[in-house]
Every structure is written in structure tokens, then in C-alpha cells.
Design a protein with these regions (language model features):
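C-terminal motif of bacterial Sec signal peptides marking the signal peptidase cleavage site
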Residues: 22-26
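Extracellular mucin-like PTS domains
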Residues: 48-53
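A detector of low-complexity, intrinsically disordered, Ser/Thr/Gly/Pro/Ala-rich segments
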Residues: 5, 37-38, 56
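Gly/Pro-rich cap/lid or specificity-loop segments adjacent to the active site
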Residues: 30-33, 54-340, 399, 405-530
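Short, charged low-complexity linear segments at domain edges
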Residues: 3-4, 8-9, 186-190, 320, ...
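Bacterial lipoprotein signal-peptidase II cleavage site
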Residues: 28-38, 42-44
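N-terminal export and membrane-targeting signals
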Residues: 1-19, 246
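Alpha/beta-hydrolase-fold enzymes
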Residues: 305-401
């Protein structure tokens, strides 16, 4: 799988990375105390006291039947997920029934899984705060209990609510191949093909993946896109009893949040988008952005090690070229291929706190001729456990991405991108250029649009947080999201730092977000931290 769409680094390491937040730098440009959506104690204004227009959904979307809108969640003790442990006694789980096809709301339905930890201060409870940690394909039901320690202050007055979006894990999760098939693909498919035979195998694997999705998950597959997930989110809001949506989205979760704001601007409450996907970029644009972003992060890492960025990048590129010819052995008996090594290098670039692990893994590969460290990092990114079982985030991720995007670049188009992408990044460029063709090759479902619609005129202020050294969602994408949301809606917050996501990493950003969620204080547009 590729770096272009995955945000597992934020999800898996959320708790550990956030615990290190106190090491980061402080804040500039103080915010104001604007409270357009709050009473004196920080609660959102009651709809009866300050009515806001319930703007209609996109034209032609039928109303939901009362059997769906009148649902009341039945919260029960959570059970253990497959291969995992049940969360603690503070957590409760339920599901909400949603239309399979929001264009036919009285037709077939599916269930969306939720998990909740209730607010500690019941007397001052504000409402529900929903989370999406990215992906697409990340399981909020699985991630939130592990990351909840980072949101203790918010949990004082909010119920913390995670959910598995449609097509993910417990919400009719998409599955496309067996663990054995996945292992075989990682072992044999070259994701930077150099010959006609490698190109053919590369495209054939993409088509086989799509066929497996259709065979195993055909009913839900056409309906797993982001616009449907955003409509699910609005039904969840209603079922939970919240007049407006309070939401914290990371990475892909920012695209979901922006889509929600576009569809339901009058129902936007307090929404924060962190590590922001560029809403103006298509598939090739995202690959181009990530080639730039990951190369920038790699060069910052090399500078931190006291190395020349150009020389260090060239050295790593030579290592990858050697692996293309001859993979490295590991103690497990598996081999470290070029493609797995690229993934292993990508993984620790999501957070500077994992840079020492990258150093150890590269030293092991270059000096000792062993691939254990990079393979271990790649396995973490790819969702592989020690027993060779893979989670299904990669399956859901591709299904959602290809349901969203109309783009289906060809092998010839990908090959034509190689010179440009090598110039952007000698390490990651070829990998990302080829990924544009392999990702949705032969996909059995047409995509919905070129780029997401995120304009939200009339919505309440939405905090848009960009980190200058973010490798996966480069800073410029946050600026474009703020612009697309519209004047007075997108409130830009800049974090001068490294890594994928700023909340919990930067005390300045964290303080601004907490004040916004808890007190309704909107920071100045252009707040800069670090």
C-alpha cells in the first residue's frame, strides 16, 4: 500500500505522540474571545434561543424516513474486536442504522458502529464530540479508546464518540483479499516497475484487488464514498440528540468534515480540521503534494542528523535501487523488498518522535545488510501483526478513495510523470508516480467526482490547522481548505513544526482548540504557533 492515502501513522501512534506534546514550541498571535456560538458557560446556544437555519441537503436528496431519524441509541458494554481486547468499563458501544444508498433512503439499510465515553461533568455537558482519525478506512471504534487519554480535557464536558465509517471494520467493512493473498502481493509485486513484465503484474494486481472487493463486498462497494459517509454523520448527530455537529477530524477526516460542512452548513457547530487534505487536488495532485511533503520531511530528518539533505537522499535512493535488485534478509525469513523499504521509511516520518527508529533501521540496512527494522516499520504501516494477519484498513481505504475519485490514470500517464516526480523526490517520487495508475486500475465502481466540494457559505467558523513540516498532508493544503470553506468560515491556524497533526503535539494549538471546543472562543484567522 502507499503513503499517498494512508494516515495510519497518526492513528496508531496518536497516544504516544500526544504524550510528548510538552516538548514542542509555544504560540504567537493571541486569539480573540469571539463567541458566536456559545453561552456564557461555553455551551452552544440553544436553538430555541438563537435559531440557525436548517439549510437543505444537496438538491434532490430525499428526506430520511422517521424510522431512521427517530432512532435512539442502545448503548451496551463493548465486546472485544477480532484479535484485540475490549476497551475499559467507561466505554459503551452501539450502532446506528443508515440507508445503504442515501438516494433511496427507504430502501436497504446498513449499520454504522459507534463507541462512546460519557462526559465526566454531567451538569456542564456540552454534547457529543465526534472523531475521525483519517485513512480513509481508520476505525474510530478501535482507535478512540487508545487515544482518549489525549482528549481528557475535552472529555470533561463532551461525550467522546468514535465511529467506523461505512465500509470500515464493524460498519459493513470492505474486504478484498485474504491474508495469504495480501502477503503474496507484498512479496512479489514491484510498486515501481522497471520492465514490461513488472508493469503488467503491477496493473494485474490492482485489477485483482478490485475484483476481490466486488466479489466479497459487492453490495456496499458502490456506496462507501465520502458524501454518503457525511450524510451518515448528520444522521448520527441527530440520533445522538445534538442540534449541531461538534467534530474533530484528522487527515482524511478533514475531507469528511469539509464535505459535511458543504452539505450541511447550517448544522456545523464546533468543527476542527487538523492535518488537512487539499480539497483542490485530484489523485495526481495528491501524489505530487505528497512527493513534495515526504521529501521535505526526509530532508528535515537528515538535517536533524547532521547530514546534507541532497547527499543523504541520494544515499537512500541508492539503497532502494539495490533492494530492487536484491531484497535484504530478515530474521523472520521474509525479505525486505524495495517497495516494503519505501513504506518503512515513510512510516516514522509521520512524527519526529519516531525519527530515532528510522535512524536505527537505516543503519541496520546500510551497515549490517539486514532488513528487520524497516520491515517492522512497514508491517506497522500495513496493519500486519506478528502472526501474519492484516487488518482491513487498506481494503476500505482503496474502496473509499476509488468510490470518491473519477480519476483512472493509465500506465502511460504514470510513466510520463516519472521525470517530474523524481525531481520532486528521488526517494518517494517514482513510488508515488506509479501509484497514480495502480490505485484504482480496473476498479469495478465509477468514482463520484474529481475533487471534493467543501465550500460552506453560512457555516459557523471552522478551525483549519496546518503544520509546516507535515509530510502526508502538506501545509499548503490547509491554506486551500480554509479558502474553499469561505471567508469567515475557514479559520487558518499555522503550526510551525514537524509531523502529521498538531493537536496534542503543539501546546499552543492544543490550547486554542480546547478553548474553541470548551468555551466557544474562535482564534484570530492566521494564528501562528511555534
Amino acid at each position: 500500500m502507499t503513503a499517498r492515502r494512508r494516515t495510519r501513522g497518526r492513528a496508531v501512534r496518536a497516544g504516544a505522540a500526544l504524550l510528548a506534546a510538552g516538548l514542542l514550541a509555544g504560540c504567537g498571535l493571541p486569539g480573540t474571545d469571539r463567541e458566536p456560538d456559545a453561552t456564557t458557560d461555553g455551551r452552544p446556544r440553544d436553538a430555541s434561543a438563537s435559531p440557525s437555519p436548517e439549510l437543505k441537503d444537496t438538491p434532490g436528496s430525499p428526506a430520511l424516513p422517521s424510522s431512521l431519524t427517530s432512532q435512539r441509541p442502545d448503548w451496551k458494554r463493548c465486546t472485544a474486536p477480532p484479535g484485540g481486547r475490549a476497551p475499559g468499563s467507561d466505554w459503551r458501544c452501539t450502532s446506528v442504522t443508515v440507508p445503504l444508498d442515501h438516494g433511496k433512503p427507504s430502501g436497504e439499510t446498513i449499520s454504522v458502529a459507534l463507541i462512546r465515553k460519557e462526559a465526566r461533568d454531567k451538569d456542564r455537558r456540552i454534547g457529543s464530540l465526534l472523531f475521525n482519525f483519517g485513512g480513509p478506512g481508520g476505525s474510530g471504534v478501535g482507535i478512540l479508546p487508545r487515544a482518549a487519554g489525549s482528549y481528557g480535557k475535552l472529555n470533561s464536558r463532551y461525550d467522546l464518540v468514535g465511529f467506523d465509517p461505512r465500509g470500515v471494520a464493524a460498519s459493513s467493512g470492505v474486504r478484498c483479499r485474504t491474508d495469504e493473498e495480501q502477503e503474496q502481493a507484498f512479496r512479489t509485486v514491484d510498486l515501481t516497475p522497471d520492465t514490461a513484465a513488472e508493469e503488467a503484474a503491477f496493473i494485474e494486481d490492482g485489477a485483482a484487488f478490485g475484483a476481490g472487493c466486488e466479489r466479497r463486498s459487492g453490495t456496499v462497494l458502490p456506496h462507501v464514498g465520502t458524501s454518503n459517509a457525511a450524510r451518515d454523520l448528520d444522521l448520527i448527530r441527530q440520533v445522538l440528540g445534538d442540534d449541531k455537529l461538534s467534530y474533530l477530524g484528522f487527515s482524511y477526516g478533514t475531507e469528511l468534515g469539509g464535505t459535511y460542512a458543504h452539505l450541511f452548513p447550517g448544522r456545523v457547530g464546533r468543527v476542527v480540521l487538523d492535518a488537512v487534505v487539499d480539497p483542490t487536488a485530484d489523485g495526481i495532485g495528491h501524489a505530487r503534494n505528497q512527493a513534495t511533503g515526504f521529501q521535505r520531511a526526509l530532508e528535515n530528518y537528515l538535517k536533524d542528523r547532521g547530514q546534507d539533505p541532497k547527499t543523504g537522499s541520494e544515499r537512500i535512493a541508492r539503497l532502494l535501487a539495490r533492494l530492487d535488485e536484491k531484497p535484504l534478509p530478515t530474521s523472520s525469513g521474509r525479505e525486505l523488498t524495495e517497495s516494503l523499504a519505501i513504506t518503512g521509511i515513510v512510516t516514522p516520518l509521520y512524527s519526529r518522535y519516531n525519527w530515532p527508529e528510522l535512524t536505527a533501521a537505516l543503519d541496520e540496512a546500510e551497515k549490517e545488510g539486514r532488513g528487520d527494522g524497516l520491515l517492522r516499520l512497514a508491517d506497522s504501516y500495513n496493519g500486519r501483526d506478528e502472526d501474519g494477519r492484516y487488518d482491513t484498513q487498506a481494503h476500505s481505504q482503496r474502496a473509499i478513495s476509488c468510490a470518491d475519485s473519477k480519476a483512472r490514470p493509465t500506465v502511460d500517464e504514470a510513466r510520463a510523470l516519472l521525470p517530474e516526480f523524481r525531481g520532486l523526490s528521488p526517494v518517494f517520487g517514482p513510488f508515488l508516480a506509479w501509484d497514480t495508475a495502480g490505485w484504482c486500475a480496473g476498479w469495478p465502481v465509477d468514482g463520484e467526482r474529481e475533487t471534493p466540494e467543501t465550500s460552506a457559505p453560512g457555516a459557523a467558523p471552522i478551525l483549519v490547522i496546518g503544520t509546516t513540516g507535515d509530510p502526508a498532508t502538506p501545509y499548503e493544503g490547509a491554506q486551500r481548505m480554509a479558502d474553499e470553506l469561505g471567508k469567515g468560515v475557514g479559520i487558518m491556524v499555522t503550526n510551525k513544526g514537524e509531523g502529521h497533526g498538531a493537536y496534542g503535539e503543539s501546546p499552543c494549538v492544543t490550547s486554542a482548540v480546547d478553548a474553541y471546543f470548551l468555551d466557544g472562543k474562535v482564534p484570530d484567522d492566521g494564528l501562528t504557533c511555534g
